């Protein structure tokens, strides 16, 4: 096999409870993570050198790019001498709370396992994923999961189909900065995850929408006041409920009326830098050999 293509899907958080800071610097969380049909497309081809080409949204360079980080890690761990060319069609915005970098990292782990015949077990892939970033293990599997720890301990959930509208203001938010402010401001968690899980188990999108909450909104909305404005606009335009994803600044609304969603999309797409009509899906990656 000389070439492989992977679709790497974004995620949103239907809840995010921040429960405290651990000794290793990470934060203990309880969250419901959900894959959505917004995706980057990556093509991997055997080569003598390592090179990443990107179209679409700009991406970091060097080890700040999680694709490069995974490549270098695997080359060292498995003593791989050959390189790889990666062509990235970047559709998931950077620093948006949608795990775009983590999705690309997960895609790289799976693609290079096949391209370089590494024959990694599922546990080995997850172990490598966790070393790269807290959201990467989820992105390997995707779907709907209750995640605990730093986001690596999973329980599968079965969410009903939901149509979503994503809105991102023209600002980038960096996760570490938001968690650092959470610690300094000494906020307390909403503990929304239990209610969201119960609503999912009942298959009730109205209860899901009513209970979605993200603790980090308390911090990010201070940095980016337009987040509250976006939420108000989505609710006025027919969203059943809305919340910020990850550390932000992307906000999503859950809709049960497709016509209202389409109208909201048309009204907002000229105002904000990124507006995307999306839906929930049951996978994190899709491979094309």
Curated annotation (Swiss-Prot):
Q: Which UniProt keywords apply?
A: ATP-binding, Isoprene biosynthesis, Kinase, Nucleotide-binding, Transferase
Instruction: Provide the GO biological process annotations.
Output: isopentenyl diphosphate biosynthetic process, methylerythritol 4-phosphate pathway; terpenoid biosynthetic process
Main EC class the enzyme belongs to: transferase
Q: In which pathway does it act?
A: Isoprenoid biosynthesis; isopentenyl diphosphate biosynthesis via DXP pathway; isopentenyl diphosphate from 1-deoxy-D-xylulose 5-phosphate: step 3/6
Q: Give the positions the UniProt entry annotates as the active site.
A: 11, 135
A molecular function (GO) term: 4-(cytidine 5'-diphospho)-2-C-methyl-D-erythritol kinase activity
Report the SS bond pairs: none
Cite the SUPFAM superfamilies for this sequence: GHMP Kinase, C-terminal domain, Ribosomal protein S5 domain 2-like
Show the catalytic activity. Answer: 4-CDP-2-C-methyl-D-erythritol + ATP = 4-CDP-2-C-methyl-D-erythritol 2-phosphate + ADP + H(+)
Chain positions recorded as ATP binding sites: 93-103
EC number(s): the record gives 2.7.1.148
The record ties this protein, via PANTHER family, to: 4-DIPHOSPHOCYTIDYL-2-C-METHYL-D-ERYTHRITOL KINASE, CHLOROPLASTIC
What does the record give as the function of this protein? Catalyzes the phosphorylation of the position 2 hydroxy group of 4-diphosphocytidyl-2C-methyl-D-erythritol.
Give the family per the record.
Answer: Belongs to the GHMP kinase family. IspE subfamily.
Q: State what protein this is by name.
A: 4-diphosphocytidyl-2-C-methyl-D-erythritol kinase
Gene of origin? ispE
